[in-house]
């Protein structure tokens, strides 16, 4: 569908939609091509070749030496799986809640378990590692595991996961450290051994730039042993089944064959760019966008040191301005961004910039914001945002 907007009496057409939500994200042509290839049997040598490549291709993205498990399901499924395969029914464990997806971990925990300890962090703030370790030291129970987000998608905070992992190891090396990386894996530097992470999960539709439908589990060797020991009932989400099948280059249940192929197409794209360059691109775009939003007098929710490289949240002047920005981007410029979630609904807007996103995509939304705010606030912002954005891209690239 063609969107049109009149500027100075000239009709401006926007033929291609620009999706800038924090998931799903735009899918590259190379991946769409892989999705369109002829179907093969999921219990055939053809699929075994595809699966083996996919399990191995994800290793550098997740910072692990172990083949990565792939489930045909949503990201929430592996949040649940990470808990059911680590925590026994009577164990005590901690969930860090700093936003809507930390709250999802909490909801999963309270569905299955009775000894759940919640550590609340102000939405928009990172977890303070020293304060959290002090909190653990005052608990009167032996803690089996700690669950946290890496990037809290609802606020755009990137938690200091490496620092937290090291601190947990020093505090009590027996504690399992489980990390939800759904909205940042593929755009950040992570290493399971270095960061003392036992389970790291993610989904296909964010920085890994596939359609929704696959979920991923990376694991330490001691976590793999723990999967075998845990008695919590589970069936489809029993990770032992996935590991056993992985050893045979297969899956325990019918997989999405096309998306497995797409994983390999994704890996080819990342190898061509160089994964370090992929990470750098995300951080440069983040810095440029933040500078541009400030130039447009839009307040940022998250401080610079803990800002995610995959999603940026900002605070319009009021709810009316928020509604106007979001709707006008869509109706007049064919650009889709996201609103707030949970307690931040109606208070912030979020721009996703992960996966198949270039500086030119962000220039489009920045220039659109200039036009929208100039009209709405009756203040001239034309050129201010794109100038700041371009300066950052030039200096950091």
Residue ranges and their predicted role:
Residues 127-186:
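Active-site phosphate-binding strand-loop segment of PLP-dependent enzymes
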Residues 299-332:
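Conserved PLP-binding catalytic core of the aspartate aminotransferase-like
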């Amino acid at each position: 569908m063609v969107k049109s907007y009149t500027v100075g009496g000239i009709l401006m057409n926007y033929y291609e939609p620009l999706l800038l939500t924090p998931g799903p994200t735009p899918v590259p042509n190379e991946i769409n091509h892989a999705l369109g290839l002829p179907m093969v049997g999921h219990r055939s040598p053809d699929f075994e070749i595809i699966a083996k490549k996919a399990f191995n291709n994800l290793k550098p993205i997740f910072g692990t030496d172990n083949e990565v498990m792939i489930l045909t399901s949503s990201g929430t499924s592996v949040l649940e799986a990470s808990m059911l395969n680590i925590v026994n029914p009577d164990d005590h464990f901690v969930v860090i809640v700093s936003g809507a997806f930390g709250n999802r971990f909490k909801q999963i925990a309270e569905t299955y378990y009775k000894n759940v300890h919640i550590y609340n962090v102000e939405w928009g703030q990172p977890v303070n590692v020293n304060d959290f370790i002090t909190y653990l030291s005052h608990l009167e129970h032996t803690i089996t595991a700690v669950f946290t987000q890496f990037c809290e998608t609802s606020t755009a905070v990137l938690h200091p996961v490496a620092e937290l992992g090291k601190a947990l190891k020093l505090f009590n090396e027996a504690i399992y450290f489980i990390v939800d990386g759904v909205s940042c894996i593929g755009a950040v530097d992570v290493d399971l051994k270095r960061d003392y992470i036992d389970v790291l999960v993610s989904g296909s539709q964010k920085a890994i730039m596939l359609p929704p439908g696959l979920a991923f589990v990376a694991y330490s060797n001691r976590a793999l042993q723990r999967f075998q020991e845990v008695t919590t009932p589970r069936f489809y989400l029993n990770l032992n089944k996935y590991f056993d099948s992985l050893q045979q280059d297969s899956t325990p249940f019918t997989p999405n064959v096309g998306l497995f192929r797409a994983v390999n197409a994704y890996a080819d794209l990342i190898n061509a760019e160089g994964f370090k360059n992929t990470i750098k691109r995300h951080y440069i775009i983040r810095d440029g966008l933040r500078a541009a939003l400030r130039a447009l007098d839009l307040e940022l929710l998250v401080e610079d040191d803990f800002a995610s490289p995959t999603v940026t949240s900002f605070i319009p002047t009021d709810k009316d301005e928020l509604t106007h920005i979001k709707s006008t981007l869509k109706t007049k410029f064919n650009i889709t961004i996201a609103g707030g979630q949970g307690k931040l609904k109606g208070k912030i807007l979020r721009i996703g910039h992960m996966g198949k996103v270039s500086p030119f995509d962000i220039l489009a939304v920045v220039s659109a914001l200039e036009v929208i705010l100039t009209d709405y606030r009756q203040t001239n912002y034309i050129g201010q945002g794109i100038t700041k954005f371009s300066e950052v891209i030039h200096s950091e690239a």
